[in-house]
A protein has these predicted regions:
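Nucleotide-binding/hydrolysis machinery
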Residues: 1-83
Length: 83
């Protein structure tokens, strides 16, 4: 028999969104060869927090990776989140 584990959707775990986004952004920066991640602007953080994340963590990961890649600037924080 298998146990069932209920994990609430990301939209119900607002406190997890920014730490997870930072984690995935740092990983993407390493993959791109950046020496560090400059962070997200207030505008970008608000976009991340306000979105409903129907695709949960997998969607968050993809959005963050795409946004960091398209931003393309190591020394400036990401301002535009590409949803």
């Amino acid at each position: 028999a298998f146990d069932i584990i209920h994990l609430p959707p990301l939209r119900e775990r607002q406190d997890y969104i920014l730490p997870l986004a930072e984690h995935y952004a740092v990983r993407m920066c390493r993959e791109l060869g950046y020496s560090y991640f400059a962070g997200f602007t207030r505008h970008a953080k608000a976009m991340l927090q306000d979105y409903s994340w129907p695709g949960n963590i997998r969607e968050l990961k993809n959005v963050v990776e795409r946004s960091v890649f398209r931003h393309g600037l190591e020394d400036e924080p990401v301002d535009e989140v590409i949803l």
